[in-house]
Amino acid sequence: MIKLLLGRFIAFGAVLLLVGARGWAGDAVAVGYNKDGIWTAATYYSSSTQNGGADYRNEADARAAAERDLMKRASEGVVRTEIIASSDRTGHVAYARGKTGKNAPAIHVVGYGGSKRDAEQQAREQLERKGAKREQEIVFRYFSHGADAAAPPSKK
């Protein structure tokens, strides 16, 4: 069930990236938790149009949109949502998670960078600093267009 939900979230993100345009845009990553404090779903929102476009959101609105999307897509039982990262900047973003031990709860992080590789490395470094060396994985990646976006995202 979780893999199905994550697949849908990734597909949704891919659609947003395909229709993306330049301009100052907000993005946010949201995680949903059940009554036991275990994460059950994660998604993100990134504006697909520049300021003034139909899908433009600033950082605050992107946070609200990510939470709404999470609640629509999440399975029943989500009792708490958390925005683990949000910004109004241009760049690549990587959402990752890992664990400190076999039965430990997942630790969620978001890395930002000028390339996919930089964003992923920043996310992995955050996991390492938090001691989450087990079951590390990059869950999804996206590119957030900002005011200084002069070129499409690199394919690194």
Task: Walk through the language-model features, giving the residues of each.
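Secreted/extracellular ectodomain signature
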Residues: 24-156
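Bacterial N-terminal signal peptides that target proteins for export
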Residues: 1-11
